[in-house]
Regions:
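Basic, helix-initiating cap at the start of DNA-binding domains
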Residues: 1-37, 41-53, 66-67
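An amphipathic alpha-helix adjacent to DNA-recognition modules
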Residues: 20-28, 40-41, 52, 61-85, ...
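Key DNA-contact positions within bacterial/archaeal DNA-binding proteins
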Residues: 56
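Hydrophobic alpha-helical connector segments
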Residues: 71, 82-114, 163-170, 190-194, ...
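Amphipathic alpha-helical packing segments from all-alpha helical-bundle domains
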Residues: 78-81, 111, 128-154, 164-168, ...
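Short alpha-helical scaffolding segments that buttress acidic/His motifs in well-ordered protein cores
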Residues: 105, 119-120, 170, 174, ...
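Amphipathic alpha-helical segments used for helix-helix packing
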Residues: 109-130, 146, 179-183
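Hydrophobic/aromatic-rich alpha-helical bundle segments in the mid-to-C-terminal region
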Residues: 130, 152-198, 209-216
Length: 216
């Protein structure tokens, strides 16, 4: 009967959805444990127990526990890609695009000061993690530079500034803010980020532009 018919691709879609849900569950379990114990003290067994999956299932998605952080990198690169689309759309000033992006980038780390500390330690102490972070930061810097270049083309960002340098300063501002917040938590991380990135945005407008970077 037509009412009971399913599209031919539906089983594949369901499998894909289940795989995505399982991967998300493993990722969330790992992030929770990294925040609680640190990455070094967390085992794959700990993660699979909390995620309620078998070790074989874990290794279907991640070769090692360190590779779980790849998922975080994917999330952040997705946030950057979305911001680039916003910038190309041209509806909002670049300063607002950057502010939204900063809040989006802070969303995952902002779940816990302990998580930020754990991630920072992993970046510093694990070569595989550090290499992946360097790669993600490089990709992110390239996307940020494209966003800032769009701002320059619109006359919203200083043309004499190198977009890649401005992108690096944006990343440094984000990292520094997250590190300080992790040591002195109080207000939510997005509030810290809004303040510091607000100062960043106030420093980059082209001469004669308003602090908000709005076009006339």
């Amino acid at each position: 009967l037509p009412a009971l018919s399913q599209p031919r691709h539906a089983p594949h879609d369901r499998r894909s959805r289940r795989r995505a849900e399982t991967r998300e569950r493993i990722f969330r379990a790992a992030m929770s444990l990294f925040a609680e114990r640190g990455m070094a003290a967390t085992t794959v067994e700990d993660i699979t127990e909390l995620a309620d999956v078998g070790k074989g299932t874990f290794f279907n998605y991640f070769p090692t526990k360190e590779h779980v952080l790849n998922a975080l990198g994917e999330i952040q690169l997705g946030n950057l890609a979305a911001a680039l689309e916003d910038a190309r759309d041209g509806t909002d000033p670049i300063a607002e695009v950057l502010q939204r992006l900063a809040r989006a980038l802070a969303r995952e780390p902002g779940r816990s000061p302990a998580l930020v500390r754990s991630l920072m330690m992993a970046h510093l102490s694990n070569d595989a993690v550090r290499e992946r972070v360097v790669d993600v930061l490089g990709q992110g810097r390239g996307i940020l530079a494209q966003i800032l270049r769009i701002g320059q083309e619109r006359g919203e960002v200083r043309r004499e500034a190198d977009p890649l340098v401005l992108a690096r300063i944006f990343q440094q501002t984000m990292f520094g803010t997250m590190l300080f917040w992790s040591m002195h938590p109080g207000a939510p991380l997005p509030e810290w980020i809004s303040q510091t990135i607000g100062h960043y945005c106030a420093s980059i407008p082209a001469e004669g532009r308003s602090r908000a970077g709005r076009r006339p």
